């Protein structure tokens, strides 16, 4: 995870045994626990494309605003300066360091662009192409106050999970 100094061994101890690493910031521990929670959310709510009957009223994660907002909320819990920004479209201007690119700044425009992005993603038949589309376009849009890249990396797994394919794994990102 970007900005996190936990080793793989420390991460494993935290996830499997709840042991926070000594000398690490609480925000780093929270980041890992949030990631675990978001992955669990995906696994619990994604059904393969061949089993979409939704028996038992179970939610089915898809390339939709509901899934994206829930992923962001899980990933950003207790990490953003304003807790109201967790799991909602950005309400303020952001700047990207060392870049002249300026993302959309009006919440209505951001929401409309996000809906368009998700509609385009759903029109893509190939799950690998859908995954790549989400991976690239969510961070470019910057729909959230922060944690856009982490959200896109997990959202990219939705079409893969639904097609019963292995999720993306990033090492040293």
Can you describe what each PLM-predicted range is?
Residues 1-173:
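FIC/Doc superfamily catalytic core
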């Amino acid at each position: 995870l970007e900005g996190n100094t936990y080793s793989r061994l420390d991460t494993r101890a935290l996830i499997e045994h709840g042991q926070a690493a000594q000398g690490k910031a609480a925000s780093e521990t929270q980041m890992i626990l949030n990631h675990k929670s978001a992955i669990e959310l995906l696994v619990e709510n994604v059904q393969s494309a061949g089993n979409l009957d939704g028996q038992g009223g179970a939610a089915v994660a898809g390339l939709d605003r509901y899934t994206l907002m829930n992923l962001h909320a899980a990933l950003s819990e207790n990490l953003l300066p304003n807790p109201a920004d967790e799991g909602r479209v950005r309400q303020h201007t952001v700047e990207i360091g060392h870049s002249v690119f300026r993302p959309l700044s009006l919440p209505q425009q951001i929401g409309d662009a996000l809906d368009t992005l998700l509609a385009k993603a759903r029109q893509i038949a190939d799950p690998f192409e859908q995954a790549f589309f989400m991976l690239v376009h969510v961070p470019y849009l910057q729909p959230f106050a922060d944690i856009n890249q982490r959200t896109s990396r997990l959202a990219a797994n939705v079409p893969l999970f639904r097609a019963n394919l292995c999720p993306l794994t990033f090492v040293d990102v």
